[in-house]
Amino acid sequence: MIKKVFILALLMLNSMLCWGENSAERTKRNFLQLGLTMYEAEDIRILPTAEIKFRDLFEAVEKAEKYILLDYFKFQQDSICGVLIERLKRKVQEGVEVRIIFDSFGNHDSDFPLSDTLQARIRESGIEIVAFDPVRFPWINHLMHRNHHKIAIIDGKTVYTGGMNVADYYLHGKPKVGKWRDMQIRMSGPIVQAYEELFWKMWGKTAPSPLPLWGSASKPQHSYEEEKALPQRVSVEGAVASRWPGESPGIMRQTYVICIDNAEHLVQIVNPYAMLFGEVRAALRRALQRGVRVQFMVSTKSDGKVNDDVIGLEMRKLMKRGAEVYYFEDGFHHSKIMMIDSLFCTVGTTNLDARSLCFDYEVNAFIFSPATTHQLQQIFYNDMEKSSTLLTPEVWQERFPPRRRIRGRIYSIAKRFL
């Protein structure tokens, strides 16, 4: 009897503690239950444009002392890539080790793919560069699981990640869509370890050369006495979710659903390929049913007509259920961000389509920081007020005539493979 009362008391206490949690605290607890690790993240900076991102990255490259690790879906053979490669060559001459991974399919799909000749010259300079999983006929099954990462790591101390590849169109746009909007996040501290471990895992899968013997972010960068002498940095908690086919195939769907299900007041999402289906769509509907305010931003113009028509149908469904849908007009918004209750956010590589959620290698940082979240919200509100159109039934009727609706319904049949 006493044992039963004790167990009942523990259950009641646990319920009371959970009742007092906010959405961020519940999400962290759910992430730990999911098997994710919570890391300290320091010196977080949102890089809201390509100009700021590449300038910041180039400065970090110049300061590198040991190694530079780059893992990108696309390395386009153009001017910004040329500038980066020349800087990397100089660092190799200074004794810094440089390794690059790029996706083979992403390269072939590029406007200006890296040529074999340029790759050979890069290797001759001392930079190790490898293509992830080359697509060779007839093994077309390799098309399904692509390396969609966008990661740069400097000395195991700093990581850059987000939606940007290495390509000129992030700076100058494309004729079809105009400006190409995107953003990155830069972080320091123990959270870099998660990205470096992911890089070496990908390198081991891709490259024949051995892993390095030198230290990584998993080891202290300074002694205890040196740490005491360093300026104190503000740190927050963060988690890193990495989709790896065959090992963690559902992790992106699970983390997004957890965040949305825990939202109490506000869900804000910017995503370029929001061909919603399954668990994520159901989570958004549940949030709306709970009275949570949902604000979703997509682009009027994107780099695919198929995407636009399917996304239009999904956005109409959300609008009819009470969501605020904003169409970004000033180019193509390629960012992949989400903010929950002004308390925490995610920045990463994941699109809300089948490729990212069910097939590709992806990685997202979940940052439990109101300050960082507010920075993203300010960008969101600025875009909403100055560069967006609120979707209404009248706007939808005007933008989606019958031919687009029919086309969208036909394409929706195959959206689990788009």
Mark where each language-model region is.
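Intrinsic disorder/low-complexity segments enriched in polar/small residues
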Residues: 4-5, 22
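Sec-dependent N-terminal signal peptides
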Residues: 5-13
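Charged, low-complexity intrinsically disordered terminal segments
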Residues: 15-418
